[in-house]
């Protein structure tokens, strides 16, 4: 379960105070699929980044499965984040790594053997229908293929929670439908 209690996020832009989030209270149950909608600049991405503390809220608490993330040290937070997959709008793939290496990257700090990592990568490549592209580099892929690599990477650690920040916004309608079906299947 995810609970957000009185989450606020304040930025300062050239000395001017900007309240991106103000007293947000939400809760999400396991298995629930929730969409956050709003105008451009409304704070949707900021809210998602506050959930996994990629951006700490200015005030408030983020509680996941009874653990208050705001109180954790860096090491504890890294462990929790292994169970939170994040799919970004702009893929965030490493250009100098093959698709396989991009997908295996989150498993680097795990206790899995090389063989187990390779097997997990193969499973994920099959899931996102990119087995034949495993030795390709991001520059050799279409936007939809890059997004599928991003999804596979987000799923590498078998997360309990998947956060998607406009995961289909730059895709054509056919690829969008494929990605949404894939995310529903994973759920």
Regions found by a protein language model. Give the residues of each.
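Helix-to-loop junction immediately C-terminal to a conserved catalytic motif
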Residues: 52
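Conserved ABC transporter NBD signature motif
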Residues: 60-68
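Conserved ABC ATPase "signature" region
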Residues: 67-68, 108, 114-132
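Short coil-to-helix segment of the ABC ATPase nucleotide-binding domain corresponding to the Q-loop/switch region
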Residues: 97-104
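Conserved ABC ATPase signature
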Residues: 137-141, 145
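Conserved catalytic motifs of ABC-family nucleotide-binding domains
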Residues: 158
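Catalytic Walker B motif of ABC-type/P-loop ATPase nucleotide-binding domains
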Residues: 162-165
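Helix N-cap at the start of a conserved alpha-helix in ABC-type nucleotide-binding domains
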Residues: 173-175
């Amino acid at each position: 379960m995810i609970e957000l209690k009185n989450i606020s996020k304040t930025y300062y832009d050239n000395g001017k105070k900007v309240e991106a989030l103000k007293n947000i209270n939400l809760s999400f149950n396991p298995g629930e699929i929730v969409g956050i909608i709003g105008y451009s600049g409304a704070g949707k991405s900021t809210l998602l980044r506050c959930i996994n503390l990629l951006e700490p809220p200015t005030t408030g608490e983020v509680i996941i499965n009874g653990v208050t993330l705001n109180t954790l040290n860096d090491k504890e937070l890294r462990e929790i984040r292994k169970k939170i997959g994040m799919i970004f709008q702009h893929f965030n793939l490493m250009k100098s790594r093959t698709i396989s290496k991009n997908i295996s990257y989150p498993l680097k700090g795990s206790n899995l053997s090389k063989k187990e990592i390779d097997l997990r990568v193969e499973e994920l490549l099959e899931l996102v229908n990119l087995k034949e592209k495993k030795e390709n580099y991001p520059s050799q892929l279409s936007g939809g293929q890059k997004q599928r690599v991003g999804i596979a990477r987000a799923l590498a650690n078998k997360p309990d929670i998947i956060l998607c920040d406009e995961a289909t916004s730059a895709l054509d309608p056919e690829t969008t439908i494929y990605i949404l079906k894939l995310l529903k299947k994973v759920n």
